[in-house]
């Protein structure tokens, strides 16, 4: 006899799903540089950051843990590389800026909660769902969530730094399922990355919802994701859960 599916666990991405930076990275970096007497353009720093971040992520994935780095050192190297690419003559002299930026990005004042996030989390709690974070963030995430008033909504928080592997690696999702004592068939993940969040969670048998955000989805992604799995905003999650539970009977 078929029974209605009842979800038990929702895991969440954080950055650009529940929270976002108050100002673009380039603006934050350039502002701190100017405070130390170094004048650089926001857009130049933004472009340099993207290049430096990509290179660092490729050369030292997951904060370089397997190479003996700490996430703090990893980010410091990103900042110094960013300023070198932005044309700062003595980028090594920017070490105090790098240290300050690490602290600033640890502060809830650098971040803001996205519209609908808190209401949606409360709604999920009212349904009796377990909630957890599965994020490719570093060790600062717990403090940021606490400062923003969001930590209390989650049973536990998993970061790729703590677990030792980043999304879409299936091990981080399996760790969440194991901690929650939940089978993947009654768990779903919510995030804004097609590769890391949507495909990563589906690979272990979880359901998945893709947050579309402010930027339009790539047409190839949109064509490959059922429309009922796409959330134009977080306020669409609870109705999407209702539809999922109604349309996925369990034998």
From Swiss-Prot:
KW NAD (keyword) present: no
Where do the coiled-coil regions begin and end?
none
Cross-referenced InterPro entries: HAD-like_hydrolase_domain, HAD-like_sf, HAD-SF_hydro_IA, HAD-SF_hydro_IA_REG-2-like, HAD-SF_hydro_IA_REG-2-like_cap, HAD_sf
> Which superkingdom does the taxonomy of this entry point to?
Eukaryota
Which residues are modified to N6-acetyllysine?
Answer: 15, 130
Keyword field contains RNA-binding = no
| A Pfam short name | Hydrolase
N6-succinyllysine modifications at: 15
Q: Which GO terms describe its cellular component?
A: mitochondrion; nucleolus
> Per its UniProt record, what SUPFAM superfamilies does this chain match?
HAD-like (SSF56784)
Q: Supply the alphabetized keyword list.
A: Acetylation
The entry's family comment says: Belongs to the HAD-like hydrolase superfamily.
The protein's name is Haloacid dehalogenase-like hydrolase domain-containing protein 3
Q: Which organism is it from?
A: Mus musculus (Mouse)
